[in-house]
């Protein structure tokens, strides 16, 4: 309600497991503009296995509620080794539930995805097969459904311009009140993130060390400092650099020019090698070829 009064667009990003009709109606009445629901696959058994709980049917019911309440629906699916071979069927499901927008998001290796890299990383053959399917669907559905294909970060020559550059346009406030330049910035343990209880958003944006640390180009080491792409991809992702090298200030190893590119390549090759050893256990069997570590609640 406060966001609507401030003239902001609000989008609920949810697993939808607890999204009842009453709750969705209340959110709409308060000014909610749209809803994004995450799906794991097209088939209930595979989807529930990936989620680690029986959630697929609840998501379908929630999607129906969203459409009946005439809220725009975004269908989001994270693509990885266990579900990417189902891409055609996943797109068909997005059409079936009446999505206005579909995000085909190749897995980004942060948080628990980073912990499970070997199990989640698609083969290069899977990616080569999937992209034309996504592009064909995007063309076919033009004017009916917006479709976004998020490129696989570990398989590109240059890194993504994460958040369009650190501290340039994005600000996030987590449930504890900490203010972050990107949703996963808390992965950088060497940075202190100021809290809205202690400082205003204006002060944090303009003056905090966390927002200024990687803002602009002055912080950049070589080869970023003299690279013609320095204001295109801004040195890549700081969180990814920290996760892969322990130092958030180095060139993102996802960049082919990074002196740390070998760290990423070794990780990718090790993951593929580990999966080859389990080559008889594939996503076609509705499971991962390697054990998956699920997040559990700690009390």
Predicted regions and their residues:
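Radical SAM enzyme [4Fe-4S]-AdoMet core and its adjacent flexible, acidic
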Residues: 6-9, 25, 29-34, 38-199
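Short beta-strand->alpha-helix junction loop in the catalytic core
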Residues: 16-17
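Flexible mid-to-C-terminal extensions adjoining Fe-S/redox cofactors in radical SAM and related proteins
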Residues: 186-299
């Amino acid at each position: 309600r406060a966001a609507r009064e401030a003239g902001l667009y609000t989008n609920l990003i949810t697993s939808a497991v607890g999204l009842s009709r009453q709750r969705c109606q209340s959110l709409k009445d308060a000014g909610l503009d749209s809803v994004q629901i995450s799906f794991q696959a097209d088939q209930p058994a595979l989807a529930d296995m990936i989620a680690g709980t029986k959630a697929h049917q609840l998501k379908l019911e929630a999607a129906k509620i969203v459409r009946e309440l005439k809220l725009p629906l975004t269908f989001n699916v994270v693509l990885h080794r266990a579900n990417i071979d189902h891409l055609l069927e996943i797109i068909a499901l997005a059409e079936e539930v009446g999505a206005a927008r579909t995000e085909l998001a190749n897995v980004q290796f942060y948080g628990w995805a980073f912990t499970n890299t070997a199990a989640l990383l698609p083969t290069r053959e899977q990616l080569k097969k999937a992209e034309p399917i996504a592009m064909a669907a995007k063309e076919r559905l033009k004017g009916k459904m917006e479709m976004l294909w998020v490129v696989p970060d570990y398989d590109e020559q240059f890194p993504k311009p994460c958040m369009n550059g650190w501290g340039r346009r994005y600000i996030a406030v987590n449930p504890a009140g900490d203010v972050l330049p990107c949703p996963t910035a808390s992965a950088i343990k060497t940075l202190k993130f100021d809290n809205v209880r202690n400082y205003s958003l204006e002060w944090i944006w303009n003056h905090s060390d966390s927002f200024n640390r990687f803002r602009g180009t002055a912080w950049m080491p070589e080869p970023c400092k003299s690279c013609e792409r320095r204001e295109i991809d801004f040195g890549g992702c700081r969180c990814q650099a920290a996760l892969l090298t322990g130092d958030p200030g180095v060139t993102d190893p996802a960049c082919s020019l990074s002196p740390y590119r070998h760290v990423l390549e070794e990780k990718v090759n090790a993951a593929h090698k580990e999966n080859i050893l389990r080559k008889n256990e594939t996503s076609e069997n509705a499971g991962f070829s390697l054990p998956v570590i699920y997040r559990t609640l700690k009390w």
